């Protein structure tokens, strides 16, 4: 569909708005003023700067200073978008320092370029203000150095040569912000920016929403993988994507003298307008194009397609099944899909090629920054890390190059018939495709069928025998370990849990469901039941029994016994009536039950529990999966660390190791473990630091979203610390108690020390416990792990990130 846009009324208004003689400048100096009715034009007479009104009928006196295309008329930049002038007495002045200053008739400043610029003012030599032929309003030092330019401060429009992205050195970010309405240029509901977590990707977000609205995807050398319309434009435009340690940006330039602009409108649509030969703006394409373009409409491992009724339809990728059969429809599509056959890294998973896909969300990905790895190199790297779920080339030109790895579920995919990219997904079986045309004979088929039946019968019989043998062997192993651990029979546990009734279901752990139960003597228990289809659960079960059986500490959950029957394995723990920590801190209503005293008690308790594992138990134990969901709370809200299935023990002075099988929870893993498989006691320290920040803020690290930037929780808190800004915390009554604020700030300081990038920089848990118990000065933290230097928002908060003891009722200052 093509649309033609014209605003002749605005043009007529601009011509007639001034009662005095209108002047058209080519250059403005500090000695000159741009009055309402005057204009500043580009050398080629394509762009103009001046005053205009957007609402002639209801608000004709509301005037804006902005840049526009002269013919056909289109506003591309507005200076005072938040603060319109009233009447036609406003004027623009260029100061001797090169600052643009907008005043009303009473000489009150309404806007200045210095308020938007991050550059420090300096003495300017003969500053000039002019418009380039590309539409860039430039304040320059004479004819050379740029003091300020409008291209650094986009509004809702991107012109040829402008950038979208981020300069990490100067902290300059280039993003689009929609207008509120067609007649109100103040910031609207939508922003378009470059997300630099993992492989950079263009994302559209509705302000205030935690998730994306639309993801144009990552750059693959030719276009963004979620914007096929841009791929179709390759003959009209040259696209440029720059990625370095200092800057990541995207820009475009037209071919064949095409005049074009990209506009983010007030409804969240990205429009490409092209000037026609008839001198009109024609809508060339729109993104999102259809409902399937909206973010993760079908959930994990699913693709969206438009059906014959022109409505979205979700389907699982081949080899996957709906996560919830009852809820698998378009209204509940976000539930997504799961593997039909679970992956099992130890049994050498296969990678299956899925062609023509929109690359999944790369927020939690790793990529080859130098773009030098081959696809085979990429496969080897992904295969060596059990947490790697898929891989692909970063650049599809010249046969493909570069490496992109995903960790976690793959979301926001769709299939394209003539667009998209190959993605290689980890599967729990080797997929073999037969493409031959020969017809198999009936005799051969019969023989094969009989052989298959015999093999299946033998396999079932052998499995039954092996189940009994393994169960008995495991039971003997437990007894030989002399663990002094009661072994319950299955009947007792079945009676205690009312045959594992749904009413007694407490939740799902790493390897299976957990049920509440009550023994005959009245003791309440929690039964962790190993899931039958858990590929790695038996080994973790054995590990957990052997590790925790003889551990005794008030901040560790107590193991009461186990149950083994065949390959059915269950752990019986003391029951924690208040569930887990995440049940409280991440819920707005329930979090009010945790005042600061209780939160601090939980922090101290977890610290003492980890210290016991690292230093005071008979073996040095690294938990490897410390998170809010694995901290249980008793009747008095005392914390108890649970779930030792992934823990590793060491004897003597050993305190670190490496593995190819990276397991745990992303968001809590330190970088050296998640990327290289290297873990140590400092891995738990990192997880503990993340947990402390989550307890204080009530936000999850990995799921943290902010309307104004793409930082995770660690990056968000770190930026607030470095810039002496304030941090958001729950609106709780305990924040009104001035006496707790120094303690809260000290906890944040300690947490930042725990999550530092390098393990050798992190304190030991013994040092952490001492830090909490004293008022001694703390070292300055360095940059945390998994931090990328991105945009920092304006925060309204109740704590200033300072660690010294200068206290006031509303704010803390000084570090």
Swiss-Prot record:
Glycans are attached at residues 93, 249, 265, 329, 385. This is G-type lectin S-receptor-like serine/threonine-protein kinase SD1-1. SUPFAM superfamilies: alpha-D-mannose-specific plant lectins, Protein kinase-like (PK-like). Coiled coil: none annotated. Residues 23-438 are extracellular. The chain crosses the membrane at residues 439-459. Residues 25-152 form the Bulb-type lectin domain. It catalyses: L-seryl-[protein] + ATP = O-phospho-L-seryl-[protein] + ADP + H(+); L-threonyl-[protein] + ATP = O-phospho-L-threonyl-[protein] + ADP + H(+). Residues 500-783 form the Protein kinase domain. The active site is at residue 625. The keyword Membrane applies. It is found in: Cell membrane. InterPro entries: Bulb-type_lectin_dom, Bulb-type_lectin_dom_sf, Kinase-like_dom_sf, Pan_app, Prot_kinase_dom, S-locus_recpt_kinase_C, S_locus_glycoprot_dom, Ser-Thr/Tyr_kinase_cat_dom. Belongs to the protein kinase superfamily. Ser/Thr protein kinase family. GO terms for cellular component: plasma membrane; plasmodesma. ATP binds at residues 506-514, 528. The modification Phosphothreonine is found at residues 659, 810. Keywords: ATP-binding, Cell membrane, Disulfide bond, EGF-like domain, Glycoprotein, Kinase, Lectin, Membrane, Nucleotide-binding, Phosphoprotein, Receptor, Serine/threonine-protein kinase, Signal, Transferase, Transmembrane, Transmembrane helix. Residues 1-22 form the signal peptide. It is a single-pass type I membrane protein. Its main location: membrane. GO terms for molecular function: ATP binding; calmodulin binding; carbohydrate binding; protein serine kinase activity; protein serine/threonine kinase activity; ubiquitin protein ligase binding. It is an enzyme of class 2 (transferase). Residues 460-815 are cytoplasmic. It comes from Arabidopsis thaliana.
């Amino acid at each position: 569909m093509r649309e033609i846009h014209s605003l002749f009324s605005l043009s007529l208004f601009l011509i007639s708005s001034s009662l005095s003689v209108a002047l058209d400048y080519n250059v403005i100096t500090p000695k000159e003023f741009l009055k309402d009715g005057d204009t500043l034009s580009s050398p080629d007479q394509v762009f103009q700067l001046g005053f205009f009104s957007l609402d002639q009928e209801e608000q004709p006196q509301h005037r804006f200073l902005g840049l526009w295309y002269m013919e056909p008329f289109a506003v591309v930049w507005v200076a005072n978008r938040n603060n319109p002038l009233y009447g036609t007495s406003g004027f623009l002045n260029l100061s001797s320092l090169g600052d643009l200053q907008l005043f009303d008739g009473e000489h009150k400043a309404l806007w200045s370029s210095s308020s938007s610029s991050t550059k420090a003012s300096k003495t300017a030599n003969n500053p000039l203000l002019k418009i380039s032929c590309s539409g860039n309003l430039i304040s320059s030092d004479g004819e050379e150095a740029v003091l300020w330019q409008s291209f650094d401060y986009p509004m809702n429009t991107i012109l040829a040569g402008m950038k979208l992205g981020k300069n990490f050195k100067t902290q300059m970010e280039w993003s689009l912000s929609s207008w509120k309405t067609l007649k109100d240029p103040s910031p609207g509901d939508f922003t378009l920016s470059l997300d630099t977590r993992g492989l950079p990707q263009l994302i559209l977000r509705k302000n205030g929403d935690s998730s994306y609205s639309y993801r144009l995807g990552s750059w693959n050398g030719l276009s963004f993988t979620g914007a096929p319309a841009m791929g179709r434009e390759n003959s009209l435009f040259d696209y440029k994507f720059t990625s370095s340690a200092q800057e990541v940006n995207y820009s475009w330039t037209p071919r064949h003298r095409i005049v074009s602009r990209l506009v983010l409108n007030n409804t969240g649509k990205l429009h490409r307008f092209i000037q026609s030969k008839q001198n009109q703006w024609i809508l060339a394409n729109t993104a999102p194009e259809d409902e399937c373009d909206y973010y993760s409409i079908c959930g994990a491992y699913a693709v969206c397609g438009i059906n014959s009724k022109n409505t979205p339809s979700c389907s699982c990728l081949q080899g996957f099944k709906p996560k919830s059969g009852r809820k698998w429809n378009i209204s509940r599509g976000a539930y997504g899909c799961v593997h039909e056959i679970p992956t099992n890294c130890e049994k050498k998973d296969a990678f299956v090629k899925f062609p023509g896909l929109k690359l999944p969300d790369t927020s939690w990905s790793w990529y080859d920054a130098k773009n030098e790895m081959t696809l085979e190199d990429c496969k080897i790297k992904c295969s060596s890390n059990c947490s790697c779920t898929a891989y692909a080339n970063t650049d599809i030109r010249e046969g493909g190059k570069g490496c992109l790895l995903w960790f976690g579920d793959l979301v926001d995919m769709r299939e394209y018939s003539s667009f998209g990219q190959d993605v290689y997904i980890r599967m729990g079986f080797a997929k073999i495709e037969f493409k031959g045309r020969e017809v198999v004979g009936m005799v051969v088929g019969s023989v094969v069928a009989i052989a298959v039946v015999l093999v299946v019968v033998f396999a079932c019989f052998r499995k039954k025998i092996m189940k009994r043998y393994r169960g008995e062997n495991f039971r003997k192993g437990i007894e030989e370990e002399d663990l002094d651990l009661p072994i319950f029979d299955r009947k007792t546990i079945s009676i205690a849990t009312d045959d594992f009734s749904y009413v007694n279901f407490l939740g799902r752990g790493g390897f299976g469901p957990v049920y509440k139960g009550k023994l005959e003597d009245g003791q309440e228990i929690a039964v962790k039941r190993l899931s039958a289809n858990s590929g790695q659960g038996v080994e973790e079960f054995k590990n957990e029994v052997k590790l925790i059986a003889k551990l005794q500490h008030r901040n560790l959950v107590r193991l009461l016994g186990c149950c083994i029957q065949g390959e059915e394995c269950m752990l019986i723990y003391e029951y924690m009536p208040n569930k887990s920590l995440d049940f409280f801190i991440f819920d707005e209503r329930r979090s009010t039950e945790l005042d600061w005293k209780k939160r601090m008690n939980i922090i101290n308790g977890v610290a003492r529990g980890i210290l016991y594992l690292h230093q005071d138990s008979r073996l040095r134990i690294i938990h490897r999966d410390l998170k809010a969901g694995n901290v249980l709370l008793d009747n008095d809200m005392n914390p108890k660390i649970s779930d030792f299935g992934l823990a590793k023990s060491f004897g003597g002075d050993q305190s670190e190791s490496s593995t190819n099988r990276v397991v745990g929870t992303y968001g809590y893993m330190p970088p050296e473990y998640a990327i290289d498989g290297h873990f140590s006691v400092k891995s738990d320290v990192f997880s503990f630091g993340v947990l402390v920040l989550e307890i204080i803020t009530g936000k999850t690290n990995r799921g943290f979203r902010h309307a104004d930037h793409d930082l995770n929780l660690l990056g968000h808190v770190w930026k607030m610390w470095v810039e002496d800004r304030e941090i958001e915390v729950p609106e709780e009554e305990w924040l009104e108690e001035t006496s707790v604020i120094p303690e809260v700030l000290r906890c944040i300081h300690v947490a930042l020390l725990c999550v530092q990038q390098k393990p050798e920089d992190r304190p030991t848990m013994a040092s952490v416990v001492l830090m909490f118990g004293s008022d001694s000065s703390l070292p300055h933290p360095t940059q945390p792990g998994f931090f990328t230097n991105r945009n920092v928002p304006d925060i309204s908060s109740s704590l200033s990130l300072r660690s010294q003891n200068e206290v006031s009722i509303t704010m803390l200052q000084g570090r």
